[in-house]
Amino acid sequence: MVADVLLTHFNQLFCLNDPGHPLTGQEMKKATIVEDGYIAIKDGLIVALGSGEPDAELVGPQTIMRSYKGKIATPGIIDCHTHLVYGGSREHEFAKKLAGVSYLDILAQGGGILSTVRATRSASFDNLYQKSKRLLDYMLLHGVTTVEAKSGYGLDWETEKRQLDVVAALEKDHPIDLVSTFMAAHAIPEEYKGNPKAYLDVIIKDMLPVVKEENLAEFCDIFCEKNVFTADESRYLLSKAKEMGFKLRIHADEIASIGGVDVAAELSAVSAEHLMMITDDGIAKLIGAGVIGNLLPATTFSLMEDTYAPARKMIDAGMAITLSTDSNPGSCPTANMQFVMQLGCFMLRLTPLEVLNAVTINAAYSVNRQERVGSLTVGKEADIAIFDAPNIDYPFYFFATNLIHQVYKKGQLTVDRGRIL
């Protein structure tokens, strides 16, 4: 078979492993590493991997050949938890954060999520589209090739749908692949204050059926937290969403442990998000149910909290984890997955290989894209992040700098030395 594109002489290829399930325990520490590696691409798919000089049959007169001595290649990075589409920004809350006002106190004052809801409701489709596109461009420049994107800053049908429509449009227009999550249960709207059950009934009866019918989202999510939605309320919504055919995610145990992990385990959610306050019993329940823990260390960093999710304990117990940005305008205003990966080492005490597995193959399972992406494997899409680094330790050791040299998306050179092509 003659390749369309042949990428050769990488210091190392991090092909990683895909055993047919998310990696856990000791599996997180391992990878298939190819020295002096090459990748052959045809029709956007990986058709061959190897070491040294490529087989002659891969090379034809039209084959594009590029050499990458001194560089490493990994699967494209996957950010599997973002709040991508929103109006406005919240830097006006920064001084309060520095003064020690808590996230929930800011929310109770009408700020936080509710502030962004007001800005998003007043934003046009084009405004939201352009703002979200800029974020995606930034992510792509940092090696991200697949992104999960939630609604949740409308809290009414008109705005929630506008957010989902923006995600759908960007999925068509932008190189990054987007996976849509419906999260109208992100907060209790001011018009339903004191009556969250009535709002959940509106979501269940009026919103979810349309989202499903129009195929606007694959997942459903809810914020199970003190002063937001209780475990019983979360169970009520997610069980109905599951009956309609949605895959489930849940924000749980971020600020307080109030039963969200139990809901995730009972309903076999694909992932439980945040988990800074998870207990040993909660870890055991998620392991037993096969729920992936999606950890968001940049949120802890941004909130200036001391308690990070117990990633080391989770992995050692045999739990599958991912890492994501939680990109949003309030509790985590960043879109930099490289920074998140570095926090995975510095603050969660994970090894570079554990982090790399978390943000590639495990993240692919978290967004139900494991058949297509997440590892450099023959037959999968050629989503490739190329780092200007001699080995996998370097991008973690040399932190706070974008070390992406190039990005390939479905076999197309998409980013070249800081420019989107």
From Swiss-Prot:
Catalyzes the hydrolytic cleavage of the carbon-nitrogen bond in imidazolone-5-propanoate to yield N-formimidoyl-L-glutamate. It is the third step in the universal histidine degradation pathway. The keyword Zinc applies. Its cofactor is Zn(2+); Fe(3+). Binds 1 zinc or iron ion per subunit. It is found in: Cytoplasm. Belongs to the metallo-dependent hydrolases superfamily. HutI family. The gene is hutI. It catalyses: 4-imidazolone-5-propanoate + H2O = N-formimidoyl-L-glutamate. Its main location: cytoplasm. NCBIfam families: hutI (TIGR01224). The keyword Metal-binding applies. GO terms for biological process: L-histidine catabolic process to glutamate and formamide; L-histidine catabolic process to glutamate and formate. This is Imidazolonepropionase.
